[in-house]
Every structure is written in structure tokens, then in C-alpha cells.
Amino acid sequence: MKKIMFIVMMGLSPIGFSGPVVEIYECQINKGKTLEDLSDMMNTFSAYLKKAGLSNSYKAHAGFQQIPIKPGSVNWIGISPTAEDYGKAIEWFTSSKDGQAFGELYQSVYTCQESFMTFITTSSK
């Protein structure tokens, strides 16, 4: 019985101790848009998060791809400290007027092709 409990606990430990949630979108800046438009969009996003009380639940970073170099690339990197915080951010994005307005804004600035999400389970020290 102890062996079974140990196996179950080991199997559940990554779930209980998983760290931040990271999502990455590989995007291209839309024709006629500039990095200044991207910066303005990020400022708007920060204001929306603050208004919604989500500043500590989700942080976004945007940058261009270095290797290999892709002209016009924009990578969106979103980080939430926990899965619960990520859920709060997604709920805001999909069900609030500000979230939907931001969706329209970002789609006017860039278009995304690929994305992935990961849970950080361990990190270097």
C-alpha cells in the first residue's frame, strides 16, 4: 500500500508544484504597422490589466525574433504565476468588453500563426 501511495504522490507532484504558465505566440506585424504601434498596444494592454486588477496575474512581453532573423516578426510572451492566474486572464480576455476590445486592437497590429503554452515545472538556480 505504501508503494502505491508513493507512486500516486510522485505522479501528482508536478501538478501540485508546477510554476508559472508561459504562452508564446509567433506573429508578424501587419502591413502599415510599426514597432511604435506595438509599443502603444502594450501600454493599452497594461492599462486594461491594471483596470481589471490583473497586473499580478499576467505579464506580457513582445519582441522580434533574433535567430533565425525574421523581418517583421513579433513574439508575444505571456506569463502568469499560476494556472489560476492564467485562468483569470483568459476569462477577462474572452468575457469582458475591455478584453474583447484588446483582442481587436492586437489583431489590427499583428497576426499570429503558431503558438504554444507550457507549465514551468523546474528551473536552474
Sequence positions of predicted segments:
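Non-heme di-metal
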Residues: 102-103
